[in-house]
């Protein structure tokens, strides 16, 4: 009869001697300066980024003050980062001659990234109705794909049947 070895799993030194606080800090999202060359647009991004007068004002602001609100990006398996929220800030940074841009890196699956991207962009006022409709359609498909609703708020009109 062959003797089986014990299946022992030992934690590393850092796991044993780190504090709850240091482990929590390691899990927190941080703003990072990411080179613009490592950032690329979200595949299927339904909103146009146009070099219009408003974009030139944004680029001037970025040149003078930097990007005030970090973009949200996710790691791309092929390298670099995919922009989930911040396409206009990215373009303004390019026009302003910047080399890096502040961003928060999040691990998001496709559905979560689509929902976040749509929600972040629908807050803007200058969206074409066709872009808005396409974005809502993307969000609907992402929510259906997840198999559940991601929020409990109802934002439509309330109709009471009698």
Give the role of each language-model region.
Residues 1-106, 113-125:
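Short, charged/polar connector segments at secondary-structure boundaries
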Residues 52-55, 87, 111, 130-133, ...:
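Amphipathic alpha-helical transducer elements in NTP-driven molecular machines
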Residues 98-107, 133-141:
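Short, surface-exposed, charge-dense and proline/glycine-enriched linear segments
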Residues 123-162:
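Alpha-helical interaction elements
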């Amino acid at each position: 009869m062959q003797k089986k070895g014990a299946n022992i799993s030992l934690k590393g030194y850092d796991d044993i001697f780190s504090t709850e606080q240091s482990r929590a800090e390691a899990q927190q999202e941080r703003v990072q300066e990411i080179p613009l060359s490592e950032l690329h647009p979200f595949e299927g991004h339904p909103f146009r980024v146009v070099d219009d007068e408003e974009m030139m004002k944004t680029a001037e602001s970025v040149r003078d003050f930097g990007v005030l609100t970090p973009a949200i990006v996710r790691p791309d398996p092929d390298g670099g980062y995919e922009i989930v929220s911040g396409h206009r800030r990215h373009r303004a940074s390019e026009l302003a001659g910047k080399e890096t841009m502040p961003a928060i890196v999040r691990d998001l699956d496709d559905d979560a990234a689509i929902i976040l991207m749509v929600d972040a962009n629908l807050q803007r006022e200058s969206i074409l109705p066709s872009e808005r409709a396409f974005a809502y359609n993307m969000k609907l498909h992402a929510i259906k794909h997840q198999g559940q609703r991601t929020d409990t708020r109802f934002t439509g009109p309330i109709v009471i049947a009698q």
